């Protein structure tokens, strides 16, 4: 087995892929009207909506902040989509190479069964339409730190359902890509996903952090399932999707109550994941530094910490990077900040 096969999950199909790209736009911007390259739109703001198709593009709003002046729209672009549709509540659009989809399940006293059905439908759609390489998922979970009707934390309830879908589909947790599981202020659970018809997908781990699906049961009856990053593309290029990254070493939260310390460790973890040594270990030849990361979403639990997090990020990220700060809850109650991004 190659080094890539030992250290990172590599899957390849024969079609060359150059991954879609993201832009952050002002919600309601007239620039979005009539743009035939739009693959999907996610509005981040102070309310939520059901998923829909607008001009052939999947669209939804997630309640991920608490002030209207912090709202923005995450716009995904690719070639002009060749087809779009709705299946089992999933709004999707596809090009020859990519599939982008959005699905939501409403608020409930229990989420495991609904989450299992949601992910089962996502897996079935990617297979039936011919996009077997799931490259990135985002999960926005309302009341993520509250308890469900059985007294189980909602995030843990969600993880049980996602794991059930993998069990039922015979899917190896190591094949699950980069992901975000983050709080929302309402709206149930919204899942956004990107899949590819072909190319190469390599899941990347962090040598300083335990692989998520190996977490001990102290974090819940079923562990989360995601890679720390996923590289997608042809051998000569590609895009690196970086999961929401926190102040965790091993499997433990560090710097309890200290948002500066947690933010610094989160950025250290991100730098470690995308660095040349770690990527080579996984079979990706080109390394990166934090200055290469763009289109970052930074999730901050406490509003009073927003300015501190903004300063820490500004000191370590590129001055030209698009960075959006969102005031929302995080999967672990002792985590104060998580950071995600991507590298072209």
UniProtKB/Swiss-Prot annotation:
Catalytic-site annotation from UniProt: 338 (proton acceptor)
Superkingdom, taxonomy of origin: Bacteria
Catalytic activity: chorismate + H2O = (3R,4R)-3,4-dihydroxy-3,4-dihydrobenzoate + pyruvate
Binding-site residues, substrate: 155, 162, 215, 228
Enzyme class, first EC level, given as a word: hydrolase
EC number(s) per entry: 3.3.2.13
Keyword Lipid metabolism appears in the UniProt entry: no
Keyword Iron-sulfur: no
Family annotation (SUPFAM superfamilies): YjgF-like (SSF55298)
Regulation of this protein's activity per its record: Competitively inhibited by 3-(2-carboxyethyl)benzoate.
Keywords assigned by UniProt, alphabetized: Hydrolase
An annotated Gene Ontology molecular function: ether hydrolase activity
Protein family (similarity comment): Belongs to the FkbO/Hyg5 family.
Cross-referenced NCBIfam families: chori_FkbO_Hyg5 (TIGR04444)
Function: Involved in the biosynthesis of the macrocyclic amino acid-linked polyketides FK506 and FK520 which are potent immunosuppressants that prevent T-cell proliferation through initial binding to the immunophilin FKBP12. Catalyzes the hydrolysis of chorismate via a 1,4-conjugate elimination of water to yield (4R,5R)-4,5-dihydroxycyclohexa-1,5-dienecarboxylic acid (DCDC).
Subunit record text: Monomer.
Name recorded for this polypeptide: Chorismatase
């Amino acid at each position: 087995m190659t080094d890539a096969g030992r250290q990172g999950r590599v899957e390849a199909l024969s079609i060359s892929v150059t991954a879609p790209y993201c832009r952050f736009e002002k919600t309601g911007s007239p620039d979005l009207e009539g743009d035939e390259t739009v693959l999907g739109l996610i509005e981040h703001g102070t309310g939520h909506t059901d998923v829909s198709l607008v001009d052939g593009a999947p669209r939804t709003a997630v309640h991920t902040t608490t002030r209207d002046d912090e709202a923005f729209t995450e716009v995904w672009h690719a070639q002009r989509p060749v087809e779009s549709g709705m299946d089992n509540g999933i709004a999707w659009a596809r090009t020859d190479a990519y599939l982008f989809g959005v699905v939501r399940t409403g608020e409930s006293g229990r989420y495991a069964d609904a989450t299992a059905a949601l992910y089962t439908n996502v897996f079935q759609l990617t297979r039936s339409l011919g996009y077997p390489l799931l490259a990135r998922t985002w999960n926005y979970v309302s009341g993520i730190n509250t308890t469900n009707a059985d007294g189980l934390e909602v995030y843990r309830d969600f993880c049980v359902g996602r794991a059930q879908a993998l069990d039922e589909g015979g899917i190896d947790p190591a094949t699950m890509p980069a992901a975000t599981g983050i709080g929302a202020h309402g709206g149930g659970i919204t899942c956004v996903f990107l899949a590819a018809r072909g190319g190469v997908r390599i899941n990347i781990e962090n040598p300083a952090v335990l692989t998520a699906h190996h977490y001990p049961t102290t974090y819940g009856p079923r562990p989360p399932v995601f890679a720390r990053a996923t590289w997608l593309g042809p051998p000569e290029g590609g895009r690196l999707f970086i999961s929401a990254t926190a102040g965790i070493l091993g499997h433990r939260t560090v710097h309890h109550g200290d948002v500066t310390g947690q933010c610094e460790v989160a950025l250290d973890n991100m730098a470690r994941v995308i660095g040349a040594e770690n990527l080579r270990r996984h079979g990706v030849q080109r390394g990166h530094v934090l200055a290469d990361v763009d289109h970052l979403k930074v999730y901050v639990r406490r509003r009073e910490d927003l300015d501190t997090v903004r300063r820490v990020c500004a000191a370590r990220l590129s001055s030209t990077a698009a960075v959006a700060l969102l005031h929302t809850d995080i999967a672990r109650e002792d985590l104060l900040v998580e950071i995600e991004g991507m590298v072209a």
